[in-house]
């Protein structure tokens, strides 16, 4: 008899098959003496579409809303039906007596496998493989410690509840908005609050009125002292007359050192990366989108097998990982990391390390290197950058704390308080892992008293006429969101909550904010693809479509409190603390209330981006929209779906102003255009680049267009596709 193993993806299945000795190729499977390994392609089974329950739902009609099937059912996804058949063929084999679920260890991974098994009416006993990396060692250890799949029944119930709740609320609300306002409008419990946060930030920027402030400094003996309010501790003076008086007084008297305080301090390295923190860093340092970072991490995890599971929300390790740290250090002991790894090995590797805490790891531990030796030459430049971030953070936490001496000088000029600060490094410790010293998670730019190198000074010293400076500044508006800062806001949206009740704040903290670490990148990407967001440089802006949508969506759907409440209840279901049927009854009642509110709402939606160009398919006027990397014309009719690309942003630099150029046209007619007015046909561009030693071939251009083709092929006007985008959270 044999055991059937179901993996989530072909690449993971191949790794498991190799470890288990399954080399014989079957239809959609790999077979060995004891095991058969097959795979899904992500989800092979999904919830049925509305029209699958009743033909009347095929037409988008407000009169039939809300759609509330008595029991939501599942169906095979047509595009992946062939692989579903391959899996069920193996399931039905008489020589298969046991199933091992080896999909991703988490709520959605559980759903991938369980829906396949449910649809196939499987009755065979199941075990669960729960691992955080796909190295040979992790797979072997995982199979040596298989769990009974029944231990994860509550996790499955939570996953189904999430999917069904999003179906009921998302599809019904999307159809209601689309029907009422005759425009492709979608909403969801995560994407809509995310838009609302961006809208609030834009409102804060619009309403911001800069206010002048003044600072007074005294330069003496090579040190700059800053005036400080003894009561508030602030260094900014709002009253210009007061600032002028302080400056004039300081010019007439000597500076006296009142106190010189020196303290030796130490600081541990920043915690290990979870996915969100890694996406933030990659956005800030390299300008990578959240989705790009996730894709690179996925490649380093699945293809190269040099980093652990990427979709984690923990920055800690469990005690059982500690014995593997030495092997992981051996694996990274190459090139630029060799000396640091050797130094880290001399530190005590035990469970007392500050980043080891079982209680702070739920499904997966922090992202760290695997025991697999890496070949840096096999990584792309982008992959190597992400790998470098993870390895340096891993090495940093294993190195000693950084030790420094902090000096704070308090001085006075005729009863006015002045202060200066300095820091002298004693032992670099973990900072040696960072060549560029960009290691600190805190924004040191906010320090009002800058740190400086201080000479040897003692209390009581009197310094004659210091050089006094009075400077005027203006307060700055809040910064616009980038993908990195938007991820931070989604992870911790408390600032954007109307209700700051302590229980709600605690709930959203425990639930992990808006969305999950595994879905936030996709949510942001979908907001761009739905033309609700656009980018200018690295900054994110709302489109007119998004601003109008937020006026039409029920207020409840715009609040982070809603998704926090859902996630907390889903976690309770996963832990067996709440019954699934109770949660779903509440969701059905909420859906009815939501649709009633949309039906009775007064409002209008106006396309303010209509062009005079008509759709070649249906004759309606096209809409001009800005995609993430392109400008497009799309049909306003949601059933038509026509779109065409007008221009694309490229990495090609203008020879005049050195800014990025756009590409318009196709093939030999393609032309590069710059905002400064420079234009260049493709042939001329290729000739120029060849002379400069950076020739661009047709293959280069084709590869670039292929890379960006995905956005151009996204079905933005298929109404049900839009609905699905709004609810896959």
Spell out what each predicted region is.
Residues 2-4, 80, 91, 174, ...:
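Basic, low-complexity terminal or inter-domain segments flanking catalytic cores
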Residues 27-55, 192-238, 397-450, 589:
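Structured, non-catalytic alpha/beta "coupling" segments that mediate domain-domain communication
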Residues 1-2, 102-105, 182-186, 262-271, ...:
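Conserved short loop/turn motifs at secondary-structure junctions
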Residues 304-305, 531:
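Glycine-centered, phosphate/nucleic-acid-interacting loop/turn motifs that mediate DNA/RNA or nucleotide
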Residues 237-271:
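Metal- or metallocofactor-binding catalytic centers and their adjacent structured scaffolds
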Residues 114, 138-220, 262-263:
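C-terminal or mid-to-C-terminal helical accessory/interaction module adjacent to the motor/catalytic core
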Residues 1-163, 230-231, 477:
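Intrinsically disordered, low-complexity regulatory segments
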């Amino acid at each position: 008899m044999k055991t059937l193993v179901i993996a989530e993806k072909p690449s993971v299945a191949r790794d498991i098959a190799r470890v288990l000795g399954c080399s014989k190729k079957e239809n959609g499977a790999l077979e060995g003496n004891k095991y058969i390994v097959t795979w899904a392609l992500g989800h092979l089974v999904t919830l049925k579409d509305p029209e699958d329950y009743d033909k009347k739902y095929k037409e988008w009609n407000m009169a039939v809303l809300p759609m509330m099937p008595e029991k939501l059912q599942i169906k095979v996804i047509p595009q992946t039906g062939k692989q579903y058949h391959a899996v069920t063929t193996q399931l039905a084999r008489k020589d298969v007596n046991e199933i091992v679920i080896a999909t991703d260890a988490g709520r959605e991974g559980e759903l991938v496998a369980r829906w396949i098994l449910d649809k196939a009416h499987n009755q065979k006993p199941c075990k669960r493989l729960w691992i955080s990396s796909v190295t040979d060692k992790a797979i072997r250890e995982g199979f040596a410690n298989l769990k009974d799949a029944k231990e994860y029944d509550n996790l499955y119930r939570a996953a189904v509840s999430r999917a069904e709740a999003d179906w009921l609320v998302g599809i019904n609300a999307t159809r209601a908005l689309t029907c009422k306002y005759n425009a492709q409008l979608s909403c969801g419990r995560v994407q809509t609050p995310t838009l609302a946060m961006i809208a609030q930030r834009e409102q804060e920027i619009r309403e911001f009125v800069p206010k002048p402030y003044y600072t007074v400094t005294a330069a003496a003996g090579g040190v700059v002292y800053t005036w400080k309010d003894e009561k508030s501790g602030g260094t900014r003076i709002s009253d210009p007359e007061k600032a002028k008086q302080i400056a004039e007084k300081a010019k007439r008297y000597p500076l006296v050192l009142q106190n010189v305080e020196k303290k030796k301090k130490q600081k541990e390295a920043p915690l290990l990366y979870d996915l969100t923190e890694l996406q933030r860093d990659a956005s800030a340092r390299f300008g990578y989108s959240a989705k790009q970072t996730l894709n690179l991490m996925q490649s380093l995890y699945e293809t190269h097998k040099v980093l652990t599971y990427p979709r984690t929300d923990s920055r800690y390790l469990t005690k059982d990982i500690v014995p593997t740290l030495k092997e992981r250090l051996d694996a990274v002991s190459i090139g630029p990391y060799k000396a640091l790894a050797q130094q880290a090995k001399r530190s005590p590797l035990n469970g007392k390390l500050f980043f080891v805490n079982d209680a702070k790891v739920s499904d997966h531990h922090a992202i760290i290197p695997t025991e697999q030796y890496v070949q840096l030459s096999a990584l792309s430049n982008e992959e190597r950058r992400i790998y470098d971030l993870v390895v340096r953070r891993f090495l940093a936490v294993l190195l000693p704390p950084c030790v420094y001496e902090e000096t704070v000088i308090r001085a006075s000029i005729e009863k006015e308080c002045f202060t200066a600060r300095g820091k002298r490094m004693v032992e670099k410790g973990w900072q040696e892992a960072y060549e560029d010293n960009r290691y600190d998670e805190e924004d040191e730019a906010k320090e009002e008293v800058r740190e400086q190198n201080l000479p040897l000074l003692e209390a009581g010293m009197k310094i004659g006429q210091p050089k006094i400076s009075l400077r005027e500044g203006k307060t700055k508006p809040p910064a616009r969101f980038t993908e990195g800062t938007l991820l931070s806001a989604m992870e911790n949206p408390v600032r954007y909550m109307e209700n700051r009740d302590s229980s709600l704040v605690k709930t959203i903290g425990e639930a992990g904010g808006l969305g999950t670490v595994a879905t936030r990148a996709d949510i942001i990407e979908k907001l761009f693809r739905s033309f609700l967001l656009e980018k200018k440089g690295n900054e994110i802006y709302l489109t007119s479509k998004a601003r109008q949508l937020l006026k039409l969506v029920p207020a409840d759907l715009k609040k982070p409190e809603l998704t926090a409440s859902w996630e907390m209840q889903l976690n309770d279901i996963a832990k067996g603390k709440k019954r699934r049927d109770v949660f779903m009854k509440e969701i059905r009642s909420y859906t009815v209330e939501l649709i009633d509110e949309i039906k009775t709402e007064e409002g209008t939606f106006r396309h303010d981006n209509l062009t005079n160009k008509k759709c070649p398919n249906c004759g309606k006027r096209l809409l001009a929209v800005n995609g993430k990397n392109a400008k497009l014309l799309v049909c306003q009719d949601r059933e038509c779906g026509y779109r065409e690309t007008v221009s694309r942003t490229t990495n090609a630099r203008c020879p005049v102003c050195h800014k990025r150029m756009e590409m318009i046209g196709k093939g030999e007619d393609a032309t590069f255009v710059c905002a400064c007015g420079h234009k260049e046909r493709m042939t001329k561009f290729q000739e120029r680049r060849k002379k400069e030693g950076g020739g661009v071939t047709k293959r280069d251009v084709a590869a670039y267009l292929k890379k960006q083709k995905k956005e151009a092929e996204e079905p933005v006007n298929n109404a049900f596709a839009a609905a699905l985008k709004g609810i896959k959270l």
